[in-house]
Amino acid sequence: MSLDAASHQPAARRLLDSALVRRVLACMIIVIMIAISIWILTYVLFL
């Protein structure tokens, strides 16, 4: 029944997908920033 409702509402599904993509992109950006900051810290410590 819920699958039927979801199939009849493509706009909501598209909105959910875009929100999920945005959340994944934000997580990736945060992880990349943390990795770069850690790399800079180790570079400064071992300089």
Swiss-Prot record:
- GO CC term (a single one): membrane
Q: Does the keyword Membrane apply?
A: yes
**Record key words, sorted:** Host membrane, Membrane, Transmembrane, Transmembrane helix
Bilayer topology annotation: Single-pass membrane protein
TM region positions? 27-47
Localization: Host membrane
Say yes or no: keyword Membrane present. Answer: yes
Coiled-coil intervals, chain numbering: none
What's the protein called, per UniProt? Protein RL9A
- What organism does the UniProt record list as the source? Human cytomegalovirus (strain Merlin) (HHV-5)
